[in-house]
Amino acid sequence: MTRVRVHTGEVNAEMEDTSLDELSTVMVDNSCGWIDIFQPEEEETREFLGNELNFHHLAVDDCFEEPASRVFVYDTHKFATFKARDADRELDTEYLRAFLKDGWLITVRHAHMPGIAEFRKRIKSKDFKKDGEMKSEYLLYQLLDSVADDWTKVLIRKSERLDEIEDQVFDPHHVYPNLLENLHEMKGDLREIAKSTTPLDELVQRILRSDEGFVTDETKLYYQDLADLTHSIGTRLENYSSGAASTRDTYISQTSMRLAESQAETAEVMRLLTIIATIMLPITAVASIFGMNVHSFGAGNGPVDLMTILAVMGGIGCSMLLWLYMKGYIGKR
């Protein structure tokens, strides 16, 4: 069901619920304000926007389709459409459509948006009285600035999260799980933000173009300030993305080094075991042959015979050690 709310620019005034049928009277009785059409039913909303307000049918079509971010100046009104963050999930976005006509800002949306909530707070404040002087262009500036500020808050949270991951990567005393997955997730989140903020920056830049005729001289300064904000968001995104990539490369390098160290330790253990086995193999063979067959070789049970056998085994062991040393398997690094 279509929900329509109106704010006529009064300080501290709440937005009033109304209906599409009553909007024409409200707009005649007041010179400026903000009309917010939420979850519009297509048939009645098309009727109101197209027939009552005489908005261009292409702009009206964009209210019920997936448009591209753009601005357009028609004969009797101006139109802008851009992405704003959806309140349901942090990085989900929905298109917000804005019409400017005779001092009125008319927004059409299909979802709850933090940017709209911030704009609602601003328009109710006592510092917002300039909307009566600058009409709908100033209202649109405040709306775009609210959306940009909302993205700035998201970036602040991402920056804090990135700092936390960097601290974990460079912590020498503890190994944290899922760091690589967290870094990939961070990179993905930054890309998703860029998909919305880059078109927003391009939209503001286009609004400022003199050939568009979208803004008046008295509001141009505000849009220039907004352009600086949207550009800084893009710059911060690039910096965070580079930081995440650098941290990921560092983590992969550290992981590779730890793996190499582990493999080196394993190789050292295997080398030591191989040396021991190599020495013990001939000694074991001697012990096996002479063990129960000592009488077959003409030897007796006296200590001299035992010492002779042990001497043979020791000589073989020493010979193996000398041979391994000469080959460089032990003693030389």
Predicted feature descriptions by range:
Residues 1-131:
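Divalent-cation
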Residues 1-5, 27-30, 164, 210, ...:
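Cytosol-facing regions at membranes
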Residues 136, 215, 299-300:
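Residue-level signature of the cytosolic catalytic core of signaling kinases
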